[in-house]
């Protein structure tokens, strides 16, 4: 809603109307992202978001921002990545004119160059909660799978979108490795991308996007076979990241980075904040794109045909002494760029499998 700051209530109304048929028939368990952060809307800009969802308690000073819940033997963990990302991508006034809030609010104009940057707002409380939650799950025999959802991406090779963020890699990927997170679901970039299982990282494998000097990006390290056609995985050896950003957008971003020297997949990475700087026109401001590049050795599959699609997951809890599986089918809509009711086609199917815990 922060893209339409003078009409935020109407945007939320329209969003709810669009979703009500689905939400009336299945639970909607959201996570906040950069576009939920609005000026004049509470300390993290999330009051409109929090007012519209009743979410599980997290026992911290920040209710509703992050939470967990269990379905069968799957633990779902929902996070607010704005707390840890370097990218400044929330509410912003680019100028040259100030942003004038709706008259009914009585709020003063917001000057050009102002951005609502909330990195670090929980002072580590979210990360401490996450570690407690994952540690408990790792020792709970009733939990076979850990699935994390967040808005921003630790692993994205989008060329025209945002890219990857080192802040997530620093704060949370070590915890995902330590406690065996199986799957991470993200959005932010409006496309589809699947990683190989990753664990650990390669150091100083990135370069500055402008100077070419070596920089630290904490490049995620793939484990196992790097066959892009492989469809079955044991996630006890590494975490798979999925970008599912094609559920509905007017700006599909199905264009991906490529290293011009090698032809390999390439990713942009934010390794530091991109706070507003003066633009070329008087009294205007811009936020720079990601500052670093790395070879996306972790990228297994990218959908270059369309930015639109949906993922469907099926969980089989298995039988005692056997295996349990999660099957993901991604359906894309190649004609959606021209027709709003394009037919969905199966793009790929993957199966995650592991030995079921003894109950």
Model features per residue range: what roles?
Residues 1-40, 178:
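Core catalytic region of metal-dependent phosphoesterases/phosphodiesterases
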Residues 5-9, 120-124, 166-167:
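Soluble non-cytosolic domains of exported or imported proteins
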Residues 9-13, 128, 169:
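Well-ordered, non-membrane alpha-helical segments in soluble/globular domains
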Residues 41-148, 153-161, 170, 174, ...:
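Metal-dependent phosphoesterase/phosphodiesterase active-site architecture
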């Amino acid at each position: 809603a922060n893209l339409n700051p003078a009409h935020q209530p109407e945007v939320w109304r329209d969003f709810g109307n669009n979703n009500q048929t689905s939400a009336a028939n299945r639970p909607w368990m959201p996570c906040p992202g950069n576009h939920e952060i609005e000026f004049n809307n509470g300390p993290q800009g999330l009051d409109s978001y929090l007012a519209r969802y009743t979410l599980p308690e997290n026992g911290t000073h920040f209710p509703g921002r992050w939470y967990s819940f269990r379905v069968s033997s799957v633990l779902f963990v929902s996070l607010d990545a704005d707390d840890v990302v370097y990218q400044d991508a929330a509410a912003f006034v680019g100028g040259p004119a100030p942003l004038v809030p709706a008259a009914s609010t009585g709020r003063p104009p917001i000057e050009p160059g102002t951005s609502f940057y909330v990195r670090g707002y929980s002072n580590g409380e979210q990360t401490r909660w996450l570690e407690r939650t994952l540690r408990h799950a790792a020792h709970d025999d009733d939990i076979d799978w850990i699935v994390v959802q967040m808005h921003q991406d630790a692993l994205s090779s989008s060329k025209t979108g945002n890219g990857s963020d080192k802040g997530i890699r620093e704060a949370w990927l070590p915890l995902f490795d330590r406690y065996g997170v199986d799957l991470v679901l993200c959005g932010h970039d409006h496309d589809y991308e699947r990683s190989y299982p990753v664990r650990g990282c390669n150091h100083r494998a990135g370069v500055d996007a402008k100077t070419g000097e070596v920089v630290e990006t904490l490049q995620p390290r793939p484990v196992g076979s790097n066959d892009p056609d492989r469809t079955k995985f044991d996630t006890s050896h590494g975490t798979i990241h999925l970008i599912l950003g094609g559920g509905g957008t007017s700006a599909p971003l199905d264009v991906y980075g490529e290293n011009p020297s090698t032809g390999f997949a390439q990713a942009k990475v934010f390794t530091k904040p991109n706070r507003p700087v003066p633009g070329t026109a008087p009294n205007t401001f811009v936020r720079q794109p990601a500052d670093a590049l790395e070879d996306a050795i972790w990228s297994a599959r990218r959908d270059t045909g369309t930015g639109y699609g949906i993922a469907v997951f099926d969980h089989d809890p298995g039988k005692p002494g056997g295996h349990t599986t999660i099957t993901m089918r991604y359906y894309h809509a190649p004609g959606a760029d021209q027709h709003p009711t394009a037919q969905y086609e199966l793009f790929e199917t993957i199966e995650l499998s592991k030995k079921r815990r003894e109950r």
